[in-house]
Design a protein with these regions (language model features):
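N-terminal Rossmann-like dinucleotide-binding module
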Residues: 1-46
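Glycine- and charged-residue-rich phosphate/anionic-cofactor binding loop of Rossmann-like
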Residues: 27-29, 297-314
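Conserved SAM-binding strand-loop segment of SAM-dependent methyltransferases
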Residues: 48-55
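Hydrophobic residues in well-ordered beta-strands that form the structural core
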Residues: 53, 92, 117-119, 148, ...
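Beta-strand-loop-alpha-helix segment that lines the small-molecule cofactor/substrate pocket
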Residues: 61, 66-124
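Basic phosphate/pyrophosphate-binding loop/patch that engages nucleotide-derived ligands
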Residues: 108-116, 131-144, 232-236
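C-terminal glycine/acidic-rich active-site capping loop/insertion
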Residues: 122, 234-305, 330, 334, ...
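Rossmann-like dinucleotide-binding domain that binds NAD(P)(H)
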Residues: 152-223, 229, 243, 309
Length: 342
């Protein structure tokens, strides 16, 4: 039985408490948050959990083996280093840190043999996303040409990070998982209408393989979207996280030129529809799968699928996007990123 403590009881932390509490091989023994009301809500639902206002006191007193850090990204380095120093296994929510310097420091942080440091990139544990990856690598869609991601909603607007820092880590993680390579350059633009940090953003990642990935994120759209499209030479994959019954579609369409006698041009490109396949996918709550994986890593000593290096790569791309946006969208080479948060 692995004893779990959760630091951070805001919007996402209680979901970790619920998932670990429902697993047979885990026990949630403590939670921490400086917000007494947030801690109280968790305590009301899970009376057996010991509440703490200060995570430092939790580290001193709570009899836990592992800690989940679900706090603002700016606090991740301090809290994660303290947890590791106390000998705990750590699962830290995305992003690993709010700057590449802190992320690099965590990647280099000394850990005892078998001590686990995992980053919570939840879509790596989504069955439909993993099916997309399988279909790419078995040649079903041919050569990948480009990827388009959209992650939008009407709020919640945050003051501590830009919309890139809030939403884009999901799509960056998905793209890296699907392509298994780092981008060569990143370019981005941010628009500010509500929060000074930027509440609408477009990011473009260019890869050495020739693939271009575009990520659109917004806090201002009226419709909640969680979509990923992968366009190949033979077919396209369409992932819609809001479609619970059919999250993935394989669209087998071809684009060809044929004669046209209209006044609009000599040739007209037309898309010829073919089969649309809905693959059968056994969907489970990705957060539950992620929690199970964390426990398996603790029990076996295996390296997490979303390890600290994986989290560092996402942070490097985020930093490149933020820098590009400050330079009116000029491309930023990944090799040119600083190694400190100064």
């Amino acid at each position: 039985m692995t004893r779990i403590a959760v630091i951070g009881c805001g919007r996402w932390g209680p979901n970790y408490v619920r998932n670990f509490a429902e697993l047979d091989n885990a026990e949630v023994v403590a939670v921490s948050d400086p917000n007494a009301e947030a801690v109280g809500r968790v305590k009301h639902r899970f009376p057996e959990v010991e509440p703490y206002a200060d995570y430092r006191k939790l580290l001193q007193e709570a009899p836990c083996d592992a800690i989940v850090v679900v706090t603002p990204a700016s606090t991740h380095r301090e809290i994660t280093e303290a947890c590791l120093g106390a000998g705990k296994h750590v699962l830290v929510e995305k992003p690993l840190a709010d700057n590449p310097g802190d992320a690099l420091a965590l990647a280099r942080c000394a850990r005892a043999p078998g001590q686990i440091l995992m980053v919570g990139h939840i879509f790596r544990f989504n069955a439909a996303i993993n099916k997309m990856r399988d279909l790419i690598y078995d040649g079903t869609i041919g050569q990948v040409r480009y990827i388009h991601c959209a992650r939008t909603n009407l709020g919640p607007v945050r003051a501590d990070v830009s919309v890139f820092g809030d939403l884009a880590p999901h799509d960056i993680s998905i793209v890296l998982h699907l392509l298994n390579e780092m981008p060569v350059t990143v370019s981005a633009t941010l628009a500010t209408y509500v929060e000074s940090g930027g509440d609408l953003g477009i990011m473009r990642m260019r890869f050495e393989s020739g693939v271009v990935a575009v990520v659109y994120v917004s806090w201002l759209d009226p419709r909640k979207r969680r979509e990923v499209e992968v366009i190949g030479s033979n077919a396209a994959l369409e992932f819609d996280d809001m479609n619970l019954s059919e999250p993935l579609r394989i669209s087998q369409k071809a684009l060809r030129a044929e004669p046209s006698y209209s006044t609009f041009g000599e040739f007209q490109f037309v898309a010829h529809a073919s089969n649309v396949i809905i693959p059968a996918i056994e969907m489970r709550e990705p957060l539950r799968v992620q929690c199970e994986h964390f426990l398996q890593c603790i029990q076996t000593g295996r390296q997490p699928l979303t390890d600290v290096e994986d989290g560092l790569r996402t942070c490097l791309i985020l930093a490149a996007a933020e820098r590009s946006a400050q330079m009116d969208g000029s491309p930023v080479a990944l090799a040119g990123l600083p190694e400190s948060g100064q």
